[in-house]
């Protein structure tokens, strides 16, 4: 219940940002810039079965997003992303390059799917939409709030009691860095790498102890993460708000 309340408050805050942008855009003579886009890349799980980023754990993911510029530097963004999750204890390597004892002992693997709805703010270092400027690219940073639904299954070759399939609905804090390039007045390319800090340890259903066992088979104090890296294409819309002519007529009278 608390997670749901936090999620609603978070999205309410993001929604207020979009509302403020709409109000500001009504200033006569102001130019509103917005984008819609699609992206594709890889989704990576990080948790008990993959304690660090592993390139081989990348699984297909797609995203659709909407951006609205609040200023030349600040952009509000909402996005929907879906992808697959995979991990295997046998792919983990320790400092000596060998399979860590815990991973070998547990011998588990995970698979599943994840759907995320997010909103947040991008900070652009350059105004790459300004066609009068020679700079048509910008690096940016992003931070926001996300709600996600994950349906995953974990199986262990050593502990049948670990086998579990289930779903999780929770919150995450997405942070990312990226790069945008304006191909033309309307078309843009993007590259982004980001991480999502979740508030659950249930993506892999391993909470620190095996079911029916007293052995430690995970870290009960380490919550799960997931990461996204990908490319995107977006289309920019421009709108210039002209002064209301009715106001001028009223003044002449």
What are these regions (language model features)?
Residues 24-68, 152, 228-241, 253:
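Short glycine/proline- and aromatic-enriched beta-strand/turn motifs that initiate or cap beta-hairpins
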Residues 72-155, 237:
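Gram-negative (and chloroplast) outer-membrane scaffold detector with strong preference
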Residues 184-253:
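Predominantly the C-terminal beta-signal and adjacent terminal strand-loop region
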Residues 25-33, 72-73, 127-137, 185-186, ...:
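Short loop/turn motifs that connect adjacent beta-strands in outer-membrane beta-barrel proteins
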Residues 48-55, 85-116, 150-170, 202-209, ...:
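Extracellular/periplasm-exposed beta-strand and loop segments of Gram-negative cell-envelope proteins
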Residues 57-61, 114-118, 138-140, 170-174, ...:
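Transmembrane beta-barrel architecture of outer-membrane proteins
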Residues 1-31:
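Bacterial Sec-dependent N-terminal signal peptides
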Residues 38-40, 64-68, 119-123, 143-147, ...:
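Residues on the lipid-exposed face of transmembrane beta-strands in outer-membrane beta-barrel proteins
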């Amino acid at each position: 219940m608390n997670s749901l309340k936090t999620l609603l408050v978070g999205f309410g805050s993001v929604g207020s940002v979009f509302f403020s942008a709409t109000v500001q855009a009504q200033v006569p003579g102001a130019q509103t810039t917005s984008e819609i886009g699609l992206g594709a890349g890889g989704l990576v799980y990080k948790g008990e079965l993959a304690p660090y980023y592993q390139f081989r754990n990348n699984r297909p993911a797609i995203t659709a997003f909407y951006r609205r510029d609040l200023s030349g530097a600040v952009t509000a963004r909402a996005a929907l992303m879906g992808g697959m999750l995979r991990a295997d204890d046998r792919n983990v390597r320790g400092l000596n390059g060998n399979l860590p004892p815990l991973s070998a002992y547990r011998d588990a693997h995970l698979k599943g799917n994840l759907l995320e709805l997010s909103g947040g703010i991008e900070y652009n270092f350059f105004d790459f939409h300004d066609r009068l400027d020679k700079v048509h690219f910008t690096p940016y940073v992003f931070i926001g709030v996300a709600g996600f639904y994950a349906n995953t299954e974990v199986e262990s070759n050593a502990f049948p009691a670990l086998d579990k399939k289930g779903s999780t609905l929770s919150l995450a804090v997405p942070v990312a860095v990226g790069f945008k390039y304006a191909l033309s007045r309307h078309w843009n390319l993007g590259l982004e790498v980001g991480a999502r800090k979740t508030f659950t340890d249930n993506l892999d259903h391993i909470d620190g102890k095996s079911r029916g066992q007293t052995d430690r088979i995970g870290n009960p104090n380490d919550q799960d993460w997931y990461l996204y890296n990908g490319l995107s294409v977006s289309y920019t819309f421009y709108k210039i708000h002209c002064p209301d002519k009715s106001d001028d007529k009223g003044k002449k009278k």
